[in-house]
């Protein structure tokens, strides 16, 4: 670590302590060239998922955006807030476990639909209609037919 007083890279750690919650490590260091003591902190750097939108722009992954979309599709339906949060958490966990740090928005939409379909077919259809930009009644008929054929 570079000494803030003399700029030397020659130092030693004289004390190390972990924060109460275990997320930060505090280290007291001493410069071996000038004797100056200074403190450094180490924190875990979370991996950030980036979403590539349909128009080509990117934005940080936002679980709240998923929850808002599900909430709109599930208005007056038997889908609890807890279930909505669980869906968003499961999607984030899946993406991180798969190492997908850049993900297409369409993949996120597909994952939401897959999970919502298991909970409430009506909420699923509402979400699908907005997400897939249904243009007329035929789009709804096609989606309903798919649900019926799969016995859901």
UniProtKB/Swiss-Prot annotation:
InterPro entries: ATP-cone_dom, NrdR-like_N, RNR_NrdR-like. Binds 1 zinc ion. One of its GO terms (molecular function) is zinc ion binding. Its cofactor is Zn(2+). Residues 49-139 form the ATP-cone domain. GO terms for biological process: negative regulation of DNA-templated transcription. It holds the Pfam family ATP-cone. The keyword Transcription regulation applies. It comes from the Bacteria. Keywords: ATP-binding, DNA-binding, Metal-binding, Nucleotide-binding, Repressor, Transcription, Transcription regulation, Zinc, Zinc-finger. Negatively regulates transcription of bacterial ribonucleotide reductase nrd genes and operons by binding to NrdR-boxes. Belongs to the NrdR family. This is Transcriptional repressor NrdR. It comes from Persephonella marina (strain DSM 14350 / EX-H1). The gene is nrdR.
